Amino acid sequence: MSIEVDWAAATSGPDGEALAERIRSFVHDKFQEITLPRFIRSVQVHSFDFGTIAPDLEVKDICEPFADFYEEEADDADTSVASEELGHELHESPYEDDMTYNPTAHNLHSFSHHPYPGEGFQPSALRSPLGDHLNPHFMPRASTPGIPGGTSTLGYHMRSLGGLSGTQTPLAAVAGGTSFASGWSDSGMGVGPRSQAARPAGPHHLAEPDLDTTNSTSRPSTANTLPSHPSLGHSGSSGSNPHTSDPTDAPQPSIETSDDPAAEGHSLPIPPRMRERRPEDFQVLCHAKYAGDVRMSLTAEILLDYPMPSFVGLPLKLNVTGITFDGVAVVAYIRKRVHFCFLSAEDADALLGSEQSQGSQNPSDDGRPRSGGDQKDKELKRQGGLLQEIRVDSEIGRKEDGKQVLKNVGKVERFVLAQVRRIFEEELVYPSFWTFLV
């Protein structure tokens, strides 16, 4: 199902201008955080414009929102809205809450950014290797009684990976026809069994057949490891008196030190607070194609090293005149918030890969089979990322007698455009997303 977007109404007016200025300021601030090469002194972003060409949107699926969209921020500035919603949830229906909403209390384009958590950030429940709210559509595992967290090494490897992609993402569950709200009956995924497994086992919890007191060679000696408890090593010795009734000669469970931080008393990361799901929450997956005239103006100052290092700086003006985009957009509506992001190429293939492969096998419009070159071009575009093409015009220096001093400085162009592509894919591609208050 295709959607026609009134692009002029959505991007014009005071709200559209404010949103364009926020995007310009955001991209400009990101360039100030980038380590520039030696031949570039600074990069400035001067303007951003949405253009006049609207994207083509085709609805692929309507499903339940991703679990990440329900996470509550610790520094959420919209505490008044949350308290108001809580009061309505206790005494009124959600439909009455929408009817009593005051539209003047919020700005249409007030938004917050949720970047992908790196080092020093709390991982979300969707990617948390040990959290109780781990999405069951990833890799369910069973917990081993007596061992906190089970014997799985998934948490060790996922700390370095940071996230999952491909068929291990929530999109794989959507493509498979399953629901995000459904849970697993695995005992290792619940809060109760996990807390029970994390408790230290007492002597009455130990199985007696596991304690071998007849063969001293079947286990390592504890005489050197625990010198303060000589009875532990003496009980398993073959030279002990079998007729003594001293209770210290009875076999005692050995105390072993564990390298697990959870066993040493270190607290595990606190799982984020999750908002309650509502029946009216929904999420739309759209196939978005865009070949428009979005414009952005940047200036990069180039340093010349002749006749001495950093002798003079020349301004290089870059004008982005349009982009070509092909990807899957995610729009989730939860209460008075709209969450927006794009999916990576791997996640998009999990949903649209079968359709694209079928399209390559179907004949073309003139009845002839499609050539293999067209399929190769599609694969190359898919490997290039969501932004398939960025059209740019550049000029350097001042104009003298109507002629430019230099044109098309390729090295600077490639660097700046690569950073624009990186900022887009890191800040707008899931698991990063943007939240708008509506």
UniProtKB/Swiss-Prot annotation:
InterPro entries: Mdm12, MMM1_dom, SMP_LBD
Biased composition (Basic and acidic residues): 365-379
Subcellular location: Mitochondrion outer membrane; Endoplasmic reticulum membrane
Compositional bias ranges of the Polar residues kind: 212-226, 354-364
Family annotation (PROSITE patterns): SMP
Domain of life, per lineage: Eukaryota
GO terms for MF: lipid binding
The UniProt record lists the keyword Transit peptide: no
A single BP term in Gene Ontology: protein insertion into mitochondrial outer membrane
Membrane topology: Peripheral membrane protein
Compositionally biased spans, kind Low complexity: 227-245
Span list, region Disordered: 110-154, 185-277, 353-379
Recorded GO CC terms: endoplasmic reticulum membrane; ERMES complex
Keywords annotated in UniProt: Endoplasmic reticulum, Lipid transport, Lipid-binding, Membrane, Mitochondrion, Mitochondrion outer membrane, Transport
Domain SMP-LTD, residue spans: 1-438
Protein family membership: Belongs to the MDM12 family.
Notes concerning its domains: The SMP-LTD domain is a barrel-like domain that can bind various types of glycerophospholipids in its interior and mediate their transfer between two adjacent bilayers.
Function: Component of the ERMES/MDM complex, which serves as a molecular tether to connect the endoplasmic reticulum (ER) and mitochondria. Components of this complex are involved in the control of mitochondrial shape and protein biogenesis, and function in nonvesicular lipid trafficking between the ER and mitochondria. Mdm12 is required for the interaction of the ER-resident membrane protein mmm1 and the outer mitochondrial membrane-resident beta-barrel protein mdm10.
Quaternary data: Component of the ER-mitochondria encounter structure (ERMES) or MDM complex, composed of mmm1, mdm10, mdm12 and mdm34. A mmm1 homodimer associates with one molecule of mdm12 on each side in a pairwise head-to-tail manner, and the SMP-LTD domains of mmm1 and mdm12 generate a continuous hydrophobic tunnel for phospholipid trafficking.
Protein name: Mitochondrial distribution and morphology protein 12
Protein species of origin: Penicillium rubens (strain ATCC 28089 / DSM 1075 / NRRL 1951 / Wisconsin 54-1255) (Penicillium chrysogenum)
Source organism phylogeny: Eukaryota, Fungi, Dikarya, Ascomycota, Pezizomycotina
Gene name, Swiss-Prot/TrEMBL: mdm12
